[in-house]
UniProtKB/Swiss-Prot annotation:
InterPro entries referenced in this protein's UniProt entry, alphabetically: ArchSynthase1/Queuine_TRR (IPR050076), TGT (IPR004803), TGT-like_sf (IPR036511), tRNA_ribo_trans-like (IPR002616)
Gene Ontology MF annotations: metal ion binding; tRNA-guanosine(34) queuine transglycosylase activity
Organism superkingdom: Bacteria
Annotated protein name in UniProt: Queuine tRNA-ribosyltransferase
Coiled coil: none
Pathway participation: tRNA modification; tRNA-queuosine biosynthesis
Organism: Lactococcus lactis subsp. lactis (strain IL1403)
SUPFAM superfamilies xref list: tRNA-guanine transglycosylase (SSF51713)
Enzyme Commission number: 2.4.2.29
Function: Catalyzes the base-exchange of a guanine (G) residue with the queuine precursor 7-aminomethyl-7-deazaguanine (PreQ1) at position 34 (anticodon wobble position) in tRNAs with GU(N) anticodons (tRNA-Asp, -Asn, -His and -Tyr). Catalysis occurs through a double-displacement mechanism. The nucleophile active site attacks the C1' of nucleotide 34 to detach the guanine base from the RNA, forming a covalent enzyme-RNA intermediate. The proton acceptor active site deprotonates the incoming PreQ1, allowing a nucleophilic attack on the C1' of the ribose to form the product.
Catalytic reactions of this protein: 7-aminomethyl-7-carbaguanine + guanosine(34) in tRNA = 7-aminomethyl-7-carbaguanosine(34) in tRNA + guanine
Binding site for substrate: 96-100, 151, 194, 221
Positions of region (RNA binding): 252-258, 276-280
């Protein structure tokens, strides 16, 4: 068994659910779990400085392999001393494998072969090729603490035979990536469990990957068009297949109820572009549901955005001012809204950790969802 660069320490299990309180130890520090990870696609979390991210308590951020490979280039990042030095972030960084972006750019399934994937750059249309070895090489150059295996992420509603072939290929790719990994002493590599909504294929994927001794395991192929109920069902049968002594990461999930429901089912780590993406449209998450700050009813509203929030935005600025900034397309408005949404999710996870410690996570979920509006007949999900 390898001595992994990433270690998981279980602190406590919640009595009534599968939730677990723990911490993940990395070469750039330790962060508590469950944790929401802000996404810094281009080596920056949009509109936020590293200092602000530390202030709001995000102990780890995510960056995107595909985007950094194309621009500025992984070799330039390596020349700068790695991603941490390049972006002046001295805490843990996770990089994805680029697979998710690649599959959104593939024009024909025939371009996905055993060797890898052919696709066109979203920047200039030139033809590119990515495979397991290249994805690992890029991430070794970036120097992230946690890396992802190159996987195929099929849409949720695909025929069984297609998903089965995809799972088997992803397992072979995972082994190739593990063999190509040059820095196991200071970078932990995660395997990604796929299988859409098919329990036997998820089991096959988990069995294949857990036999390979990765540093941790991701659950992929969710938040790709399936319902909330379907996601929970997949988590119900998938997380118990994963080792208890390693981190579990649910990829691409950031809606508040999905975060809580993932934790209930034993997930430790989550990421999503949701908080910053919706902030740019003036949509804000509050303890009382979502707010579209562009709405005319906030024009003369001189109260804080969220009376239960103590973030910089809510303690200093009013709804009327935020509405004005967003309507005027002012950069400061994007910053204030992004800061609030990130603070909201990072602190939601802090509250969730407290609820696990107190063994009352189900009551916490009920109170939160009722206040947020999820339990109303017309409640809207993000």
């Amino acid at each position: 068994m390898t001595e992994h660069a990433i270690k998981y320490r279980l602190i406590k299990k919640e009595k009534h659910t599968g939730a677990r309180l723990g911490e993940i130890i990395t070469p750039h520090g330790t962060f508590p779990t469950p944790m929401f990870m802000p996404v810094g696609t281009q080596a920056t979390v949009k509109t936020m400085s590293p200092e602000e991210l530390k202030t709001l308590g995000s102990g780890i951020i995510l960056s995107n392999t595909y985007h950094l490979w194309l621009r500025p280039g992984d070799e330039l990042v390596a020349e700068a001393g790695g991603l941490h030095k390049f972006m002046n972030w001295d805490q843990p960084i996770l990089t994805d494998s680029g697979g998710f972006q690649v599959y959104s750019l593939v024009q024909n399934k025939k371009n996905i072969t055993e060797e890898g994937v052919k696709f066109k750059s979203h920047l200039d249309g030139r033809e590119l090729f990515l495979n397991p070895e290249k994805a690992i090489s890029i991430q070794n150059n970036l120097g992230s603490d946690i890396m992802m295996s190159f996987d195929e992420c099929p849409p949720f509603y695909q025929p069984y035979d297609y998903v089965k072939a995809s799972v088997e290929r992803t397992s072979r790719w995972a082994e190739r990536g593990l063999n190509a990994h040059r820095r196991p002493n200071d970078q932990g590599l995660f395997g990604i469990v796929q299988g859409a909504g098919f329990e036997d294929l998820r089991r096959q994927s988990a069995r294949d990957l857990t036999s390979m001794d990765f540093a941790g395991y991701s659950i992929g192929g969710l938040a790709v068009g399936e319902s909330h109920k379907e996601m929970n069902a997949v988590l119900d049968f998938t997380t118990p297949m994963l080792p208890e002594d390693k981190p579990r990461y649910l990829m691409g999930v950031g809606a508040p109820d999905s975060l809580i429901d993932g934790v209930i089912r034993g997930v430790d780590m989550f990421d999503c572009v949701l908080p910053t993406r919706i902030a740019r449209n003036g949509t804000l998450m509050t303890h009382f549901g979502r707010v579209n700050i562009r709405n005319a009813k906030y024009e003369h509203d001189f109260t804080p955005l969220d009376p239960m929030c103590d973030c910089y935005t809510c303690t200093n600025y009013t709804r009327a001012y935020l509405r004005h900034l967003i309507k005027a397309d002012e950069t400061f408005g994007l910053r204030l809204c992004s800061y609030h949404n990130l603070h909201f999710l990072v602190n939601l996870m802090k509250d969730v950790r407290g609820a696990i410690m107190d063994d009352n996570l189900l009551e916490f979920r009920e109170d939160f969802c009722e206040r947020y509006g999820y339990n109303q007949p017309n409640a809207k999900d993000f």
